[in-house]
Amino acid sequence: MSEQPDYPAVELTEEGLAQAADAAIRAFGVASNLDELNIARRDHLGDAAPIPQARRSLGTLPKDQRKDAGRLVNMARGRLEKHFAQVKEVLEAKHLEEMLKAERVDVTVPTTRHQTGALHPITTLSEKIADIFVAMGYEVADGPEIEAEYFNFDSLNFIPDHPARTLQDTFHVGEPGSSQVLRTHTSPVQMRTMLSREVPIYVVCPGRVFRTDELDATHTPVFHQVEGLAVDKGLTMAHLRGTLDHLAKTLFGPETKTRMRANYFPFTEPSAEVDVWFPNKKGGAGWIEWGGCGMVNPNVLKAAGIDPEVYSGFAFGMGLERTLQFRNGLTDMRDMVEGDVRFTLPFGVQA
């Protein structure tokens, strides 16, 4: 660091102060960069500089001279600081311009490609199905995963000793006698919707469900379903069939077909299994079991306070893991739940 020059004392006169200010302004003017300007500022505005020293010497003057001398010192200092600010602004602009030139980015240089993440295929498939139904005028409904037995079983026409209610099939949670379970299907959302909304009702209910299955190539204790419910006047199995046909063709392609096989579910009557003809099935085109469906059981409508003599409804549901598995030719359901990022990256499975 350079030493500060040893300046002679400044006369507390207008001429003496003007000479000191002129010397400082000349020093500011010859500075070629901010570092040199800061050195000049220290030399001419620092504590040992002439004008600050002149200010401190005001106390040695007779009282009647201090006011005028103080005014002259302040004028000189103000002139100096104003000029310093002007020079600093110019040098800062010059420094910024030089810095920008030195840091110029060559846009022709190839960049490093960063790997991006992707939504899990189950999430993407769920959102796609929801979008299909929203386009048909349906609403998306959701409900709690920890559910009362009443909504999971009783209100859906499950008899008290139905095997699905046992510990072998259902996770019972909470204190003994609390009647709380991890929902085994998304059908409770349908009942909650019927209780909370006025008819007509058209909703689709995607969500996570839980069953006491062992994790293997075709089963998982935590999986995803999507269910649909329509309640209105005059609905029939024909409306249900048309809805499922539209869903299948939109999801799998225009050559896709559906068929129904009679079955039994407590909450629908009549009930059916729905199969889909999938032209891109691994091993060749063929029929694949897809889900369950049927007309809403009158007892379920009554539990929701809906008159089955006036209104009818249909419902359907399918597993998203199974849908993704046959649509994308996956052989092991464990790939969907083990969290391997290679499974979800864009170049992997696309949903």
Curated annotation (Swiss-Prot):
Which EC class heads this enzyme's classification? ligase
Name the principal localization, coarsely classed. Answer: cytoplasm
Q: Does the keyword Magnesium apply?
A: yes
**Cofactor binding, note field:** Binds 2 magnesium ions per tetramer.
What biological process terms from GO does the record include?
Answer: phenylalanyl-tRNA aminoacylation
> What cofactor requirement does the entry state?
Mg(2+)
Q: Where in the cell is it found?
A: Cytoplasm
Q: Which residues bind Mg(2+)?
A: 269
Q: What Gene Ontology cellular-component terms does the record carry? A: cytoplasm
Ordered alphabetically, the record's keywords are: Aminoacyl-tRNA synthetase, ATP-binding, Cytoplasm, Ligase, Magnesium, Metal-binding, Nucleotide-binding, Protein biosynthesis
Provide the E.C. number(s) assigned to this enzyme: 6.1.1.20
In alphabetical order, the GO MF annotations are: ATP binding; magnesium ion binding; phenylalanine-tRNA ligase activity; tRNA binding
What reaction is this protein's catalytic activity?
tRNA(Phe) + L-phenylalanine + ATP = L-phenylalanyl-tRNA(Phe) + AMP + diphosphate + H(+)
Under PROSITE patterns, the record lists:
AA_TRNA_LIGASE_II
**So which domain of life are we looking at?**
Bacteria
State one Pfam family annotation.
Phe_tRNA-synt_N
Q: Which PANTHER family match?
A: PHENYLALANINE--TRNA LIGASE, MITOCHONDRIAL, PHENYLALANYL-TRNA SYNTHETASE
Can you tell me which family this protein belongs to?
A: Belongs to the class-II aminoacyl-tRNA synthetase family. Phe-tRNA synthetase alpha subunit type 1 subfamily.
- Record's subunit section: Tetramer of two alpha and two beta subunits.
Please give the name of this protein. Answer: Phenylalanine--tRNA ligase alpha subunit
Gene that this polypeptide is encoded by: pheS
